[in-house]
């Protein structure tokens, strides 16, 4: 009978959360432990706010760097387009001349085409693989419709430059649009009084304390979405404060990410323009319009002879124009490559900005998830329910303290504290709260 009464007594003590070995933990002690743990959670919430403000500073710095790079990019774009215009002008003037050396070039072209087709199809079958039959028919038609004069003036290189220019302009427009929408959202966000007014340290104390801080009334924000409509000195209200913020962060990141990994966003590769290897780009161009096959002219002697045909004896002016065309073409290719390098740098800057927007979600999103909590009369967001002490089950047994807490809306969380951190240690509840918050964040990430 005594044993039964003892078990009932222990169970009742456990239910009231007052067991620590043989020593009772009073309600006042549990309350004080809850207060100390809640203060740590409060500091972590304030750190989340500071962290977001640091992200704001980084984004502003990145934006200034982006503007500088954009200025360089615009200048490079102008130089490239000037060179392209000169190339097109020279091409137009050259086409206006009657075709000279026509018989010589046509004879060489008839010998060039079979070699070019064979070389291209071997490459396609080995590297590109899919759809060789269709590509072969398209190539046959393309070569029959092409002129050796087009070949002679490097028309394929000119067309590639023009197509590349179109793609580069599109990529830049997409990046600018996505960045402008993202920064517009961020500007709206950081204009809110939540970020523009800071509490004075002399008046600040924990929102978990018993006393309300005196209210300070600010003019209502012009934002439709107000992040913190109540006083900064009132108790924390997660629904009003954090949820709208993280929704806007998510919107800003979506505005940038919508195009970041799409094919339209990828900068065109120009290595093949100046002779560099880029098999994927060549495969794509061959499938698109067969002009990629013309890049293999160096492997066919008769094709090379077409490029070497000298018509200056028949028309010196035409030869001079061709030289001007080749010079402007080389310059345009160099400037196009340089512009593409700058465009890729700009793209990396944009990706870096997107990753900065991701940091608040990674580090502080747990705070926004508190928005669904019911703000009840309970002033504690970490409440200690039980404290027990026993010997650990390990190869080297030692005394440990187990603390069961509820953090926000969580199920009970059991935290084990080694004997090195005694309950009298000022760091005891900070350690408990830190481990509880780690468990809480881990579970929220899984959910």
Curated annotation (Swiss-Prot):
Glycans are attached at residues 85, 102, 144, 289, 326, 352, 372. This is Clusterin. It is a peripheral membrane protein. A motif (Nuclear localization signal) lies at residues 77-80, 441-445. Antiparallel disulfide-linked heterodimer of an alpha chain and a beta chain. Self-associates and forms higher oligomers. Interacts with a broad range of misfolded proteins, including APP, APOC2 and LYZ. Slightly acidic pH promotes interaction with misfolded proteins. Forms high-molecular weight oligomers upon interaction with misfolded proteins. Interacts with APOA1, LRP2, CLUAP1 and PON1. Interacts with the complement membrane attack complex. Interacts (via alpha chain) with XRCC6. The lineage of its organism: Eukaryota, Metazoa, Chordata, Craniata, Vertebrata. Belongs to the clusterin family. The modification Phosphoserine is found at residues 132, 394. Keywords: Chaperone, Cytoplasm, Cytoplasmic vesicle, Disulfide bond, Endoplasmic reticulum, Glycoprotein, Membrane, Microsome, Mitochondrion, Nucleus, Phosphoprotein, Secreted, Signal, Ubl conjugation. Disulfide bonds join 101-311, 112-303, 115-300, 120-293, 128-283. One of its GO terms (biological process) is response to misfolded protein. Pfam families: Clusterin. Proteolytically cleaved on its way through the secretory system, probably within the Golgi lumen. Proteolytic cleavage is not necessary for its chaperone activity. All non-secreted forms are not proteolytically cleaved. Chaperone activity of uncleaved forms is dependent on a non-reducing environment. Its main location: secreted.
